[in-house]
Regions:
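Charged (often Lys/Glu-rich) extended helix/loop segments that serve as interaction or gating elements
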Residues: 34, 276, 282-285, 290-440
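Short clusters of hydrophobic/aromatic residues that line enzyme substrate/ligand-binding pockets
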Residues: 15-17, 23, 185, 364, ...
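Structural preference for beta-strand elements that scaffold enzyme active sites
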Residues: 68-70, 89-91, 110-114, 135, ...
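Active-site loop/helix belt of alpha/beta enzymes
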Residues: 2-5, 167-316, 381, 407, ...
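A charged N-terminal "starter" segment
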Residues: 1-159, 195, 203-208, 419-440
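Hydrophobic face of alpha-helices
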Residues: 50-53, 230, 274, 391
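Active-site-proximal loop/turn and secondary-structure-junction residues that shape catalytic pockets
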Residues: 75-77, 98-99, 119-121, 140-142, ...
Length: 440
């Protein structure tokens, strides 16, 4: 089996191998891009981005016509990607003033922006309301009062959703589990705090409560948590209708859809989640006598993960006979913290030796001053020498968005590839960039 076949489910849709035995993405030679733009380098495939956006609308839209897909910007956002999502008809889920600013700088339609977050700052809420965001997803009682106060001062009525915690364990990593009662996010249904917030929202002078939101976590491989959450939330909505006259006009089950990172961790396709979510919304709406609400779906990783590939250059090679061989590259935990933070697993490809036999099992490690700076454990690769190019697929989500300047390193450049052309969409940092905010 060729590398191309072996990696078929994790490489971008346009990936291939050229006559030189080099990995290609979007018709561009990855090794040549490493020379042109230097390394570390992140490559995003435009066709994969657009194709995945279209697939979400296709799979959810054909099962539930009143669907809006909004991209979860925390996975990674810059202006170039925001413009693509705008063109594909998506909305944006943002969680900070910074993400709001990126959206605005890309002329993203603010009425399709949903502002999330468990501790929104006053100035962030003022920006959001001033710029006309479509929805503020209220996370707690303090925020509810604050949003109403700011909306009143601005002389508007702000549409809001309430974020609820349904008390469901999505069985993912504890750091990315968000739907349980013991969570910093949301208003628990079981404790009565969700009802308290709902009553307060309905009586607020400058708020319009139009829906409910849940988010269960990230990297969820089963549709069952979504089914359970919908049943709980729709039951709550029906109860609130009877007790307080609340009408559920919009509902979001969040995102968190898993993607495949390695050959031994297959993930369900989009259709699997769409069928479960849309079917359950229909059945539970009927069961509880609710008018089917508008569906808001919030994929992040599931849109950008596979579209991104990280490119590194091999430097030092350390072979400890009978123990292990280490291949050090010029990036690592500063641009991809996920292996160190979550124990995340990746595959690796030697981009300039794709067709060569896999002769070695090695650890691919970064250049940073931590023993935990390991990008790929037990990677099966051809024999490499300094200067070879390592590609790590499925690097589009939660790598660059969590990147740091650890060890005063420089954040990498990013290119967008399409039909043999590579567009620089973020330049590499310089040493002057590192010091630009220092005050002597």
């Amino acid at each position: 089996m060729s590398i191309q076949e072996k990696m078929a489910n994790i490489l971008p849709h346009t990936a291939g191998v050229n006559k030189r035995g080099h990995l290609t993405i979007g018709g561009c030679d990855a090794a040549k891009l490493a020379v042109k733009f230097d390394t570390p380098l992140y490559i995003f495939d435009e066709a994969t981005l657009r194709g995945t956006c279209a697939e979400f609308y296709k799979e959810f839209g054909r099962r539930y016509a009143d669907t809006l897909v909004i991209y979860a910007a925390k996975a990674f956002l810059n202006r170039a990607l925001a413009r693509i999502f705008k063109q594909e008809g998506l909305g944006l889920d943002v969680v900070s003033g910074g993400e709001l600013s990126i959206a605005r700088s890309a002329d993203f339609p603010m009425d399709k922006v949903f502002f999330h977050g468990n501790n929104k700052l006053r100035e962030e809420i003022e920006l959001a309301i001033g710029w006309g965001v479509g929805r503020i997803v209220v996370d707690n009682l303090r925020e509810l009062a604050l949003v109403n106060q700011i909306a009143k001062k601005a002389g508007i009525t702000q549409d809001i959703l309430l974020r609820l915690t349904p008390g469901i364990d999505a069985h993912t990593h504890e750091y990315i589990t968000t739907g349980v009662i013991d969570s910093k996010f949301g208003l628990p249904i079981a404790t009565g705090q969700a009802e308290e917030a709902l009553v307060e929202a309905l009586s607020a002078s400058n708020l319009r409560l139009i829906g409910l939101h849940v988010h269960l976590g990230s990297l969820i491989f089963s549709a069952e948590p979504y089914r359970k959450a919908i049943e709980i939330v729709f039951g709550f909505a029906a109860d609130m209708r009877e007790r307080h006259g609340f009408n559920l006009c919009e509902f979001s089950p969040g995102g968190g859809f898993a993607v495949q990172y390695t050959q031994d961790t297959p993930a369900p396709d989009i259709a699997h989640f769409a069928q479960a979510i849309c079917g359950t919304i229909r059945s539970k709406s009927k069961e509880f006598g609710l008018k089917p609400p508008r569906l808001i779906v919030e994929p992040g990783r599931a849109i950008v993960g596979r579209a991104g590939v990280a490119i590194y250059r091999v430097g030092a090679i350390k072979d400890i006979p009978g123990v292990r061989k280490y291949i050090a590259v010029d990036g690592g935990m500063a641009d991809n913290i996920r292996p160190a933070l979550y124990g995340s697993k990746y595959e690796a490809i030697v981009a300039n030796k794709v067709n060569q036999k896999l002769l070695e099992r090695v650890n691919i490690v970064g250049k940073f001053c931590e023993s935990g700076d390991v990008l790929v454990k037990d990677a099966e690769i051809p024999r490499v020498v300094p200067g070879d190019i390592i590609a790590i697929p499925v690097s589009g989500a939660y790598c660059l968005s969590i990147a740091s300047n650890y060890n005063a390193s420089l954040k990498p450049a990013i290119v967008l590839v399409k039909e043999g052309k590579a567009l620089l969409i973020r330049r590499r940092e310089t040493y002057d960039d590192l010091m630009q905010f220092d005050v002597d």
